[in-house]
Amino acid sequence: MASPSALPSLGQDWNYQSLIPTKSTPYFILTLMVMIVAYAWPSSTDSSVKKLPLVNPAGFFSMKQAKQQYRRSAKSILKNARKQYGNQPFRMITDFGEVVILPSEFIDEIRNEPKLSFSGGLEQERTSQLPEFEAFAILSNRSQLLQTVVKKQLTKFLSKVTEPLAQEGAHAVSLNLGESQEWRELALRPAMLDIIARMSSRVFLGEEICKNKEWLDITKEFTVNFTSAMFELSAYPVPLRRFVHWFLPLCKVLRATNSRAKEIIAPVIAKRAEIRRAAQAAGQEVPFFNDALDWLDQEAKAMGVDYRPDAAQLMLSFVAIHTSTDLLGQVILDIAQHPEIVPEVREEIVRELRANGWKKTSLYNMKLLDSIMKESQRRKPIGMAIMRRSVTEDLRLSNGLLLKKGMRIHVDMHRMQDEEVYENPDEWVPKRFLDMRTQAGKEHLSQFVTTSGDHFGFGHGEHACPGRFFASNELKVALCHLLLKYDWKLAPGTAVNPLMRGFSMLSCPTAKVLVQRRENIELDIDSI
């Protein structure tokens, strides 16, 4: 029997008569009842935390309403919960069931807790078992292959990638922004996405593939569609997702993207294998290409881990491109609304690049630019709750709360906008962290790549984002080109507010800016 072309959403009226097999009615009814109960019944929560308030309660057959409330109004739900319950944990129904939300004050207590699992938290969401999300399994795998590659290989390689990043950044910025000295309107997010995709691909796959238009399109499409497909799928209860994913439009797109990625990466791997065989046969040194393809292969062999190279490249591209694109766009939006800071930033960029050229130390010394990036991330992080973890063994917190094995927790990110921590927290203060560097004991904490209990845009503790050091350099290189070569201002009437979807808080995807190439640039940074 042919598969149906589309699956009705759970909000539609189904034509059950057309779906019920006449000879299998008892089995269909049983299956239907299981599906309904699975959809309606809340995820189980141990009685030890039943005393915690549930901030978006759902009764029998009303789970859908609670999840829709979370998807539309997570920010206001969190705000009301803080107001009502103060610094106490509470429960919340999300797309992935019920979770315990811990206030930010608990972040130092749990940051390195071995009974809380990062990979387990991802595995519980059960998407990595589906073919279109196979790349996600690389991130959630307990072997930590991807994280190891970033920590051991990419971070070690940072001093060697600054010049390639600068070269690719110059090309990508010119390609997207043009050379016109007349003001023109620009859709911000697509341009920033392309710039970051090109720069990241230069480091991950080398100069040849980073110019491959099909690969660039794949990485950009995957970055955009992966999160949207997850959001689309999360509207359905977990037990149904293994069935409905076959019918969802964005899931179909992802499966096609995965196939295209394999078609591009497989010949590259085969070609490299042949080069190595030829070198070995000739008694020559076997080449190591020193990019993410070789890093992954090296670490996987050392760990004895099987993996799909194309899936690993997609996930590596996703984690690098998704967050960096978002923050780069947010920084430009913030600067466009505060042009008074631009001359001082340009002065810093020119001073450091003129003195030392495109070096890792030059980027490190751009402390005002560093402060701006950290402030934009503080004011608009990529989410409202962070540090998703699953409890692997019963754990009692300092307040006496017993977290039982199998439960899930998130940490509220409100502390990054708390007036008790930051003065005027709702304002964008570009020198906030630059000034903080002068305070005793806070010079290190004020750096963009440093995580703390007061600023955890990259997470905190053992599982803090290992790629933040690369992201810092990549963003600074991109901003050097964008700010030194171009003038910026908001397009009239453009939207600037973040897009809220559940706990996600994305830089405005429809924002538009006006941009023009500067005529008299203080330093030719393309020839240093």
Language-model regions, residue ranges each:
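Conserved cytochrome P450 K-helix/beta-meander segment immediately N-terminal to the heme-binding cysteine loop
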Residues: V411-L445
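Cytochrome P450 heme-thiolate monooxygenase catalytic core
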Residues: T162-D326
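Conserved cytochrome P450 K-helix E-x-x-R motif and the immediately C-terminal K′/meander segment
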Residues: R71-K79, A355-L401, M413-H414, E420
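N-terminal membrane-proximal hinge/A-helix region immediately C-terminal to the signal-anchor transmembrane segment
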Residues: A2-L145, D454
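Cytochrome P450 heme-binding "Cys pocket" and the immediately downstream C-terminal segment
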Residues: I341, E462, R468-M505
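Classical protein tyrosine phosphatase
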Residues: H322-E347
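Charged/polar low-complexity intrinsically disordered regions
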Residues: I93-E98, S104-I107, N112-L205
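Cytochrome P450 heme-thiolate "Cys pocket" and heme-binding signature region
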Residues: D435-K476, R501
